[in-house]
Curated annotation (Swiss-Prot):
Its EC number is 6.2.1.-. The keyword Magnesium does not apply. This is Piperic acid--CoA ligase. It is found in: Peroxisome. Residues 274-343 are annotated as: SBD1. Its cofactor is Mg(2+). Keywords: ATP-binding, Ligase, Nucleotide-binding, Peroxisome. CoA binds at residues 272, 451-452. A motif (Microbody targeting signal) lies at residues 546-548. The keyword RNA-binding does not apply. It comes from Piper nigrum (Black pepper). Monomer. It is an enzyme of class 6 (ligase).
Length: 548
């Protein structure tokens, strides 16, 4: 094997030390976490920066046990799907672990989703129960599902939660759910195998329809072992992670919450991103690891916040979701010289991880680091599919124990993404250098990455074409300093139409989450297409960028 990790078989292998994975076939996500935590019952597990509430590991375990029994008494059983549609709180991971302890399956919804978006996901995943908050109830009430409301009967903004006359179905408040669970000291007796499904996390596809990524207990346990391996090899003391990234997303739920709690680290929950609250919380809770997305890095680069807030506890800033510009990294390094900035690469289909930089040694701008232990990769020629050696650009394929089992109810998409040898075809273009560092340079997929979220152009195009005065439309990414990319549209109007830009923007804004809203609309006579009718999206992107 070369210094790059490249072998004669065309496969790149991890240069990190190997990880020992648990081999008990009957291990669940929940049992694995708590069999380890019994050694440190008094250590802080979860803190809520918004409410000030805290749970040590003993309290955390007891609450998960009670909630799992409570859910069982509500009729949730092995194989059932439960939707968590809520902002971040310490009760999000409690509910997640309680659900999977029953052998049931968690699916999550971004709180920014519209009613139509969450309905599509519910129609696909068919949940038996929704766990939400009063402020989001109007978006899911029509589903007619029994619900659990997190928090007290007074909602977070001081208003009374919806009364029964507004509720279509049965609502149980979280405090009542805990009481329903009773005073128990064991988890419900359910037979769970590592091969059982634990989570359905939705990932946008280029088809414009969001797809349920099937992740097993083995996937999540393996990911946790891999994610925390650097801390273990370096012999680090227990760390404190701040989680303001949505727990509805693989980064927040699996990489931060589950993986770090599994190691015995503490997780501080922030309901939603507010830079000054995040920075205050770093000092208050002595946060050592800060996980961010590029827009937050840009905010950190603009000002030396360390002069205003106590950031002395920080040991690492980890940035995922999209590559960072050289200027942003340099400014952050200048502002926070004691904190290495670590970039990584992953996707929902790989439980959020594939590669990560190592803080020590020479840094390379734009690199996403080296492969995690047990992850293999290929760089494949996009036309003839032959494996490529270092410093040659091709599609990134990855394989490992963290890779999804497929897409829910979508065998065709599964077959296109995972081949018979278990390789996940990422749709991303990249290359490894001679030292085994991966650089991701473009996406074959046409997803737009806006503020760390995925936006499918085809979804927005479908909505545009549903307007009776729009004949044709194309949506492309446009570079943005704050968001990374934003969606913009080129629209062909009907001859008699008087539509203007604001009307089109409003039409879309009323139907989608804020991060999917169009930032610009340009009216054109035609959309560039190939002879077969396929939109020539890349040509349009290149043309637009040449004018920037």
């Amino acid at each position: 094997m070369e210094k790059s990790g490249y072998g004669n078989d065309g496969i790149y292998r991890s240069l990190r030390p190997p990880v020992l994975f648990p081999n008990d076939p009957n291990l669940s996500v929940t049992s694995y976490l708590f069999q380890r935590s019994d050694a440190y019952p008094d250590r802080l597990a979860l803190a809520d920066a918004n409410s000030g509430e805290t749970l040590n590991f003993a309290q955390f375990k007891a609450m998960v046990q009670r909630v799992s029994h409570g859910l069982s008494r509500l009729g949730i059983k092995k194989g059932d799907v439960v939707l968590i549609f809520s902002p971040n709180s310490i009760y999000f991971p409690v509910c997640f672990l309680a659900i999977v302890a029953l052998g049931a399956v968690v699916t999550t919804g971004n709180p920014q989703y519209t009613s139509a978006e969450i309905t599509k996901q519910a129609n696909d995943s068919k949940p038996k129960l929704v766990i939400t908050v009063p402020q989001l109830w109007d978006k899911v009430n029509h589903l007619g599902l029994p619900a659990v409301f997190l928090g007290s009967k007074i909602s977070g903004d001081g208003t009374i939660a919806p009364s029964n006359r507004n509720i279509n179905g049965t609502v149980t408040y979280f405090s009542n759910l805990v009481e329903l669970g009773g005073h128990v000291s064991e988890f419900p007796p359910v037979s769970i195998k590592r091969s059982d499904i634990a989570a359905l996390l939705y990932s946008s596809g280029t088809s414009g329809t969001s797809k349920g990524v099937i992740l097993t207990h083995r996937n999540l346990i393996s990911t946790a072992c891999m994610t925390t391996s650097d801390q273990e090899f370096d012999g680090e003391d227990p760390n404190v992670f701040l989680c303001f990234l949505p727990m509805s997303h693989v980064f927040g739920l699996v990489i931060i919450c589950y993986s770090q709690l599994m190691r015995g680290n503490s997780v501080v929950s922030v309901e939603k991103f507010d830079l000054e609250m995040v920075l205050r919380s770093v000092g208050k809770y002595r946060v050592t690891y800060l996980c961010v997305v590029p827009p937050v890095m840009i905010a950190l680069a603009k000002q030396n916040w360390g002069k205003i807030y106590d950031l002395s506890s920080l040991k690492r800033i980890i940035c995922g979701s999209a590559p960072l510009g050289k200027e942003v990294i340099e400014e952050c390094a200048k502002n926070y010289p004691h904190v290495p900035i670590i970039q990584g690469y992953g996707l929902t289909e790989s439980c959020g991880i594939a590669s990560l930089e190592i803080p020590e040694g020479v840094r390379e701008y734009g690199s996403s680091g080296i492969l995690f232990p047990a992850v293999e990769a290929k760089i494949v020629h996009v036309e003839n599919l032959t494996p490529l050696p270092p410093n040659q650009l091709g599609e990134i394929w990855i394989r490992g124990p963290n890779m999804m089992q497929g897409y829910l109810n979508n065998p065709q998409a599964t077959k296109l993404t995972i081949d018979e040898q278990g390789w996940v075809h990422t749709g991303d273009l990249g290359y490894f250098n001679g030292e085994g560092r991966l650089s991701v340079v473009d996406r074959i997929k046409e997803l737009i990455k806006c503020k760390g979220f995925q936006v499918a152009p085809a979804e927005l195009e479908g909505l545009l074409l549903s307007h009776q005065e729009i004949l044709d439309a194309v949506v492309i990414p446009y570079p943005d300093a704050e968001a990374g990319e934003v969606p913009i549209a080129y629209v062909v109007r009907a001859l008699s139409s008087t539509l203007d830009e604001e009307a089109v923007k409003k039409f879309i804004a009323e139907q989608v989450a804020p991060f999917k809203r169009l930032r610009k609309v340009t009216f054109v006579n035609s959309v560039p297409k190939s002879a077969s009718g396929k939109i020539l999206r890349r040509e349009l992107i290149a043309k637009v960028r040449s004018k920037i």
